[in-house]
Structures are given as structure tokens and as C-alpha cells.
Amino acid sequence: MFEQTLTSDALVTTTHNHAAEPTQRPLRDSVQQALRNYLAQLNGQEVIDLYDMVLSEVEAPMLDVIMQYTRGNQTRAAVMMGINRGTLRKKLKRYGMN
């Protein structure tokens, strides 16, 4: 569904610029455009569980990139994400990344 990639530079820029101007949101803009494209391709078909679908499309690659960046260090990855380690472990298990 989402065919756009997030570079590590973009992730770092996005992370460090929480107070960035509204026009400087490459990740948000990419997700928004991908959603528009997806909905346009539906041709009026009903969508069920869109929230869960979008979340998994964003969350799984994010977890993959962060786990690579931290070289598998779950504690460091959890701190980076602002979640506790147990939550991270559940998410990794959900996507078969444990």
C-alpha cells in the first residue's frame, strides 16, 4: 500500500524537529499522500479496519529500521520510541520480528 520509503536522515530530521514548521513534515506528507492514493484506487468500495491497516503499514517498517539502527538492542529502541520495553516486545512479536 505505502510504496514510499523513509530514509534514516528523514527519520532523524523528523525526530529532532518536533517543533518544525507545519510545512516541513515529510513523513506526514508521505503518509497523507499514500492514503489519498489508496482511497482513490478503491472506486467506492467499503474499507474496514483502515486504522489498523495504516498503523501496521507504518509501524512494522519503523520497528524494522529502529531495530537495525540499535543493532537489536530492545532497551535502546524502546527509549528511542518513547515506549516501555515490554510494549516494544509485544509489537515485535505481533510483526514476527522477535
Swiss-Prot record:
Residues 74-93 bind DNA. One of its GO terms (molecular function) is DNA-binding transcription factor activity. It comes from Aeromonas hydrophila subsp. hydrophila (strain ATCC 7966 / DSM 30187 / BCRC 13018 / CCUG 14551 / JCM 1027 / KCTC 2358 / NCIMB 9240 / NCTC 8049). Gene3D superfamilies: Homeodomain-like (1.10.10.60). Activates ribosomal RNA transcription. Plays a direct role in upstream activation of rRNA promoters. Belongs to the transcriptional regulatory Fis family. This is DNA-binding protein Fis. HAMAP family: DNA_binding_Fis. The gene is fis. SUPFAM superfamilies: Homeodomain-like (SSF46689). Signal peptide: none annotated. The lineage of its organism: Bacteria, Pseudomonadati, Pseudomonadota, Gammaproteobacteria, Aeromonadales. Homodimer. Keywords: Activator, DNA-binding, Transcription, Transcription regulation. InterPro entries: Fis_DNA-bd, Homeodomain-like_sf, HTH_Fis, Trans_regulatory_Fis.
